[in-house]
Amino acid sequence: MTAAHKQKAKLLAWLKLILWGDSISQRIFHFYIYCILLGAVLLFLPFALKTDYQKVISYEVDLQGHTISKQTASYGFLDALFLAVSAFSDTGLSTTVVSETYSVFGQTVLAILLQLGGIGFVVIAFLVWRLFKLHKKGKYSFYEKLMLQSERGGSKLGTTSEMIVVSVLFLFMVELLYGFLYTILFYFIPAFESASVFQSSGKVSNQLKALIVDSTKRLPVVHNLNLAFQYGFFHSLSAVNNAGIDLLGANSFAPYRTNWGIVIQWLAISQIIFGGIGYPVLFDAYEAIKKRRLYGKYYKHQFSLFTKLAVLTNLIVTAWCFLMLLMVEFIVITSLTNTIAHLNVEKAYLVEGLKNKSNQELQSLIFGPIPAASRVMQLWFGVISSRSAGFSVFPWSAESDIIKGIMVIAMFIGGSPSSTAGGIRTTTLAVIFLTLKAKFRGQKEVKVFKRSIDGQTVINAFLVAVFGLVSVVLIAILLPLSMQQPLSFVDSLFETTSAFGTVGLSSGATKIMALEPTRNLFNYLTLGLLMIMGQVGVSSSVLTFVKKHPQGNSFSYPREDVKVG
C-alpha cells in the first residue's frame, strides 16, 4: 500500500471515528447528538414559533387575569438547541414559556424528542426494524442485543430484546390510557391562571415574591375539547418519560395544586414511577405475573437483585426526602408555612385585592382550602417529581434554602438505570452504602440478598458518584460568573443538579440566562452537557471517550501499597 493510500485510509478512519464512533457507547452518543441537532433545527424553523423569532421568558397576571408584565427577548438557535437537549434528555429546563413561544408544530417536535429520548432512540429504531423487517424466528444479532443492553437493557443479554418489547408496550399503553384520562380532567376541572401575591416592586424577599394564588381567568384548556386532547396526550408523554415539559403556562402544574387538581397530581405521580423505575423492574414484574398465572398461586417468583435494590432504594430515598421536608416545613421557624402565618409589615406590599386578607385567608388562597393537607400533598408531589420528572405545583424559588438542599440530594440520586430517569441512579447509591457497610463490618465482600457484588461494580459505583458530584459542584461554582443578576450558590447548585438529574425543576437561573444568551453561552453549553450526561449515564458518558484498545493493558508492574486517608 502506497503512502497516499495509507494517508487516505487513516483519514477515513478518523472521519468514521468522529462521525460514527468506534465503540457501542460512542455510537449511541453520536445518535443522540444527531437527534438533538435535528430537533434544534426543526425548533428554529419560523413555523415552529408563534411569533417572529421572539420568545416569552415569563409573564405575570393580576387577580383578574390581565397580563401586567411579559418578559420577552429575541429567539436564537441557542434557545432551540438548549430546549432540544432538554427535551431529548427528558429534563424540562427551558429558557422560554413553551405554551407561549411554540406553535403546534413546535410542540409536536418537542413531543417526538421527549419520546425518542425517554423510550430510547436505539430501542425505538429496534422496534421499528422489528415491525417492518421480521427476523427469522425472532433472532437478533449479538451486536444488536449489545446496543439495546447498553441503552436500556438489564444484566442478562439473552432476555434483552424480550424485555425491551414488554416494557415499551406497557409504557405505550400507559401513555394512551392516561392521555384519555388527562383529556377528560383538563376539560372538566376548573383551573385558573396563577397570579402573584406580592407586588413585583415591593420590598419583600424573593421567596415571598414568588408566591402565587389563583386569578379569576380560566385556563384556555377548560371546556375546550381540542386543547384538552392536545394537552392530555402531551402531558401523558411528558410524565411517562419523566420530561417535565408542560403546556400549562409559566407555573407548570400550579393551577392544579388544590381541589380536583390533586387527581391530576396522582396520575402524574403514577406515570413518573412507571417511567423511572427501570425496564428490568417492569419486565421482572411482568415475568412474576405471567408465571404466577401459569403455575398457580403457589409459585414464588425470584426477583432479580437489580429489582430488589432499585425498588428498595427508591422507597427509602423517597420516604427519607419526604419526612425531611415535612420536618422542615412544620417545625423549622423559617419555613414557608410559618413565614406566611406571621406576616406583618410585608402586608403593605400585597397586590390589590389581598391587602385586607388575614394570614389564615392568605394561607388558604396560596395552599388550598385545607392549607396543611394541601401543603403536604404539594411536598409529596415535589419529592416524586424531583426524582427525575420536573413538574411542579409550587414555585421552587419560593422555597427555603434548606428545602432546596434536600431536593438537591433527591435530584442528584435520580431514578433507576435503564429508565427514563437521570442522576447517579438508585442502584449506584445502594452499592455505595452496601460497600461502606461491608467495610465497617470488616467483610471482604459486598453482600446483599444472598448475593455478592462484583468488585468492578463497586469501583464503577464510586466513579459515577464522584464524577457526577465533581461535575455538578464545579459547574455550580462557575454558573453565576456570567449572570447579569445575582445568583446564590444554593440556587446555582439546584439548577445544575436539576440538569444532571434530568429533572427540570428550576430556581430561576435558566430564566436569567435567557435574557442574554450570547453572554451566557458557557452556561447554555455546560447545562446542556450535564443534561446529556444525566440522560446517557455517567458510566456511558465516560466510556464514550475511553479508548477501545488502550496501551498498557498487556502487562502489569509489581504492586506496592500506598497509605491513604
UniProtKB/Swiss-Prot annotation:
Localization, per the record, is: Cell membrane
Give the UniProt record's GO annotations in the biological process aspect.
Answer: metal ion transport
Please spell out the taxonomic lineage of the organism that makes this protein.
Bacteria, Bacillati, Mycoplasmatota, Mycoplasmoidales, Mycoplasmoidaceae
Q: How does it sit in the membrane?
A: Multi-pass membrane protein
Q: Which GO terms describe its molecular function?
A: monoatomic cation transmembrane transporter activity
Name the UniProt record assigns to this protein: Uncharacterized cation transporter MG322 homolog
Q: Where are the transmembrane segments?
A: 28-48, 73-93, 109-129, 169-189, 262-282, 315-335, 364-384, 393-413, 461-481, 526-546
Q: Which domain of life is it from?
A: Bacteria
Q: What is its main location?
A: membrane
Keyword annotations for this protein, in alphabetical order, are:
Cell membrane, Ion transport, Membrane, Transmembrane, Transmembrane helix, Transport
**Record keyword Iron present:** no
Any Pfam family the entry gives = TrkH
Identify the InterPro entries for this entry.
Cat_transpt (IPR003445)
GO CC, any one term: plasma membrane
Protein family: Belongs to the TrkH potassium transport family.
Q: Which organism is it from?
A: Mycoplasma pneumoniae (strain ATCC 29342 / M129 / Subtype 1) (Mycoplasmoides pneumoniae)
